[in-house]
Curated annotation (Swiss-Prot):
Name assigned to this protein: Acyl carrier protein
Gene symbol of the encoding locus: acpP
Modified positions (O-(pantetheine 4'-phosphoryl)serine) in chain numbering: 40
Matches recorded under InterPro entries: ACP (IPR003231), ACP-like_sf (IPR036736), PP-bd_ACP (IPR009081)
Pfam families: PP-binding
PANTHER family xrefs: ACYL CARRIER PROTEIN, CARRIER DOMAIN-CONTAINING PROTEIN
Species in which this protein is naturally found: Cyanidium caldarium
Protein family (similarity comment): Belongs to the acyl carrier protein (ACP) family.
Length: 86
């Protein structure tokens, strides 16, 4: 089972890579748009990269609710747990 810390590190890495910024800039409460300068296309690409990395599906409605690293991590944990319990 993947730990929360491992998920956090992977999400930070994805955000860093997608936005072309250093991992040190990607904090747990970093807002993708307000703090890290992501635009709407960046947000779509972040969601797609997260889906691919964790083998999950994120609906458009859910994607709109994910605006920072913490929310992404919590969503991924919920998805993984729901998959395991299905």
């Amino acid at each position: 089972m993947v730990t929360k810390e491992e998920i956090l590190k992977k999400v930070q890495s994805i955000v860093s890579e997608q936005l072309g910024i250093s991992k040190e800039q990607v904090l747990v409460d970093s807002h993708f748009t307000n703090d890290l300068g992501a635009d709407s296309l960046d947000n779509v690409e972040l969601v797609m990269a997260i889906e691919e990395e964790f083998n999950i599906v994120i609906s458009d409605i859910d994607a709109e609710k994910i605006s920072n690293v913490r929310e992404a991590v919590e969503f991924i944990i919920d998805k993984i747990n729901n998959k395991a319990n299905a």
